[in-house]
Amino acid sequence: MASRSIVNSMNGKELELDKVLSSHRGEKHGIIIPDFPDSDAIASAFTHQLISLQYNISADIFYWGKINNPQDIVLVKLLDIELIRYSETLDFSGYDGSVFIGTQGTTTTLRQVLEASNIKPILVIDHHEEEDFIHAEFYDIRKASSTSIIYTDYLKKGLLKLERSNPTHIKCATALMYGIMYKTDRYIWAKEEDFQAVAFLSNYADSSLLEEIVNQSRSKKVMDVIQKALESRVIKQNYSIAGVGYLRAEDRNAIHQAADFLLTEENVHTAIVYAILQNGNREVLSGSFRTRKLTLDPDEFLREAFGRGEIEVYYEGKSQKVRGFEIPIFFLAGTGGEEYNTLKWRVYDMQVKQKLFNKIGVSEEREET
């Protein structure tokens, strides 16, 4: 528990969290982050792990999928953040509760695993729109650029007192700084609260470690997907639309980076990149939406284009103008040979483009790119 003087200065969510953690003193918790976690979720989970130690709570961080962004891989390795990738041999029976960070249950397969193991959810802390999907003891769902902002606020309020002489605290501050940097697209979309958080963290973070994380280059796979997006893109009324075929589920981050890249092209205000993600026999059409147009609402655009009941739209961070989306592939899912897969992709590619063209209000004839 935080010291009495610090507790007396607390109010709001940090005081409520202090009370909840105090009531679970001595327990073992599983921290759950999204299946394909980004630096924001990783940094926040790492910070929660350190805060938990103040209450004699041991906590392990779990994810289901894969970390494939070069910066995120370096973040984990350089800062010695221990993450456990789920496998069927893992046994959750020794855990007293679960903590969901950077997800409210819809972006992690582990929610069902924990439910089957009768592990009760204790906390949900996230910066996305409230989904009311998990029934937990404590919620802190804020409209913020990142979950790292929320955890920085906890640190400022005294849930963990950072010390410059503590190497682990230095790594924690560095991780949170990068989480904020990533979610604000290197501060392009940063607001006052982001700069205030960074100003606080800069007193403890290691700038040389941060520089090494930031300067990681794109992987060959990401470059291949960007090249495919450039080759297949269709530009209509300042919208750049590209389908990049089939990808493994763990390579989904390449879709986001390709959309970021297309948005840098001259006279393009909106980029939409999509692919069919394969994970065994399960397939889903996954896409990324980026726009610089202030009057364009990403949620409304996508739901009106594809149908409100047909698509899941989620906030990817970086700005209010960035979204990810998924459309399930049901009985057509699964591989059926090269010819079958080629035909299936053509059908989905044509259908997605047609719906987007209809929403934009243009014909489907290809423009010169």
Model regions: which residues?
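Divalent metal-coordination and catalytic microenvironments
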Residues: 38, 48, 76, 126, ...
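Short alpha-helices
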Residues: 127-199, 326, 333, 350, ...
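Active-site cofactor/cluster-binding pocket
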Residues: 77, 82-137
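Hydrophobic/aromatic beta-strand patches that form the interior of the parallel beta-sheet core
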Residues: 62, 99, 121-125, 137-140, ...
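Gly/His-enriched, cation/cofactor- and phosphate-binding structural elements
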Residues: 11-31, 35, 45, 58, ...
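Glycine-rich, Lys/Arg-enriched anion-binding loops that position phosphate/diphosphate groups
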Residues: 170, 181-282
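Anionic-ligand anchoring segments at beta-strand to alpha-helix junctions in alpha/beta enzyme folds, i.e.
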Residues: 27-93
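Helix-enriched interaction subdomains in cytosolic or periplasmic regions
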Residues: 1-11
